[in-house]
């Protein structure tokens, strides 16, 4: 009987009798890469919702590096893969400081919405003015912990919830008006005495504050130099509301115009308010036009009611805040809880429809209790950021 071996004279192991075929096969495999290329990680991370980035950053240093790169956010913007996130400044008695909370609505519908305090950030000054540019939030002035007005300015990187200090303003300010026009931050008032530093402008690129000494006050201007109730940016002007009057500051011409009660604009302008697609939305508790939500068209100079079968929670309208949430109207407000001794913070998301007739209709897209507390919360700010 003859036995035929399947092993040739060369040997399938390369002629090395000390190696078996399995070891030889493993040696011939291509080398395993030591790490995943950044380009591959970025192309994958781009498709993932930003609310998951904090978890992804824990996987490795490479993931953290990619998620922290500005190139990732530029790519998200170019590919229209940005997310809108809501932030709120909320304080509790005695209201000396406020904390920043995040409300992420880009989650599956089966998960409850919840305001989450960002504990990596220090408490922020009560009465500070806040503006956002991209993923940066600028916190300007306000009362410090000793309840004294401050000129401090800080910037928050909303990608990673970190903050750092910026150069101080030339004056201390509380409840100042602030707005971004032509890439520059204008800060108005918030201080009792009016002088050449009453309006300051911040150069974002060079990080330099400058006063605007040559602003001209138009007839009827009655600014008392106190803190303001609210302000919005519309048609390249900063509209300012105090307890008695309204004003419009136009940086390009350096004019500050008074808006008297006789003007149509002042008829229903209240806080809370926000601007969506060039229109000013407000809550009118008296429902003068038949609905609680009204809208002002600065081109037609007319107020209209926002129609629709929407029902708002029974909260104190004057203590609410509104925000432009990706073209939708977002409202954050407080009410007494069904549980005795507790306070509820409600979130309302209203989808807006601009019909051909010029009418605007609203439909509640989301309604939820997002925070419950034994203390009475004070909502200083409600702002949407998209990046």
From Swiss-Prot:
Extent of the Kelch repeats: 136-183, 184-231
LRR repeats: 105-128, 196-219
Residue span of region Disordered: 1-34
Keywords carried by this UniProt record: Kelch repeat, Leucine-rich repeat, Repeat
SMART domains per record: Kelch
Domain F-box: residue ranges: 31-78
UniProt keyword annotation of Secreted present: no
Listed PANTHER family: F-BOX DOMAIN-CONTAINING PROTEIN (PTHR24414:SF65), F-BOX/KELCH-REPEAT PROTEIN SKIP4 (PTHR24414)
Name assigned to this protein: F-box/LRR-repeat/kelch-repeat protein At2g29770
Species of origin: Arabidopsis thaliana (Mouse-ear cress)
Lineage: Eukaryota, Viridiplantae, Streptophyta, Embryophyta, Tracheophyta
């Amino acid at each position: 009987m003859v036995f035929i071996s399947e092993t040739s004279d060369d040997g399938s192991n390369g002629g090395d009798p000390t190696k078996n075929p399995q070891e030889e096969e493993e040696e011939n495999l291509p080398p395993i890469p030591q790490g995943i290329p950044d380009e591959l990680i970025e192309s994958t991370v781009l498709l993932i919702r930003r609310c998951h980035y904090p978890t992804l950053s824990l996987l490795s240093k490479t993931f953290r590096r990619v998620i922290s790169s500005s190139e990732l956010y530029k790519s998200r913007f170019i590919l229209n893969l940005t997310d809108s996130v809501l932030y709120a400044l909320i304080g509790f008695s005695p209201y000396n400081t406020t904390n920043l909370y995040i409300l992420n609505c880009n989650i599956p519908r089966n998960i409850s919405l919840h305001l989450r305090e960002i504990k990596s950030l220090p408490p922020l000054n009560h009465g500070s003015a806040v503006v956002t540019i991209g993923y940066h939030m600028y916190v300007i002035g306000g009362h410090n912990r000793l309840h004294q007005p401050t000129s401090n300015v800080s910037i928050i990187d909303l990608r990673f919830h970190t903050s750092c200090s910026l150069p101080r303003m030339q004056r201390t300010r509380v409840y100042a008006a602030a707005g971004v026009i032509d890439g520059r931050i204008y800060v108005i008032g918030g201080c009792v005495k009016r002088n050449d530093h009453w309006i300051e402008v911040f150069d974002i690129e060079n990080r330099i504050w400058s006063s605007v000494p040559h602003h001209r006050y138009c007839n009827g201007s009655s600014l008392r130099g106190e803190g303001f109730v609210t302000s919005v940016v519309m048609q390249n002007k900063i509209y300012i509301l105090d307890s008695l009057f309204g004003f419009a500051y136009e940086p390009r011409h350096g004019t500050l115009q008074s808006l008297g009660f006789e003007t149509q604009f002042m008829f229903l302008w209240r806080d809370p308010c926000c601007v969506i697609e060039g229109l000013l939305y407000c809550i009118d508790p008296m429902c003068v036009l038949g609905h609680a939500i009204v809208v002002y068209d600065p081109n037609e100079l007319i107020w209209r009611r926002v129609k629709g079968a929407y029902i708002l929670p029974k909260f104190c309208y004057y203590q609410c805040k509104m925000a432009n949430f990706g073209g939708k109207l977002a409202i954050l407000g407080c009410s007494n809880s069904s549980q005795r001794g507790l306070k509820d913070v409600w979130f309302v998301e209203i989808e807006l429809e601009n019909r051909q007739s010029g009418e605007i209709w609203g439909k509640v897209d989301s309604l939820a209790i997002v925070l419950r507390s034994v203390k009475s919360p004070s909502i200083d700010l409600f702002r949407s950021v998209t990046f």
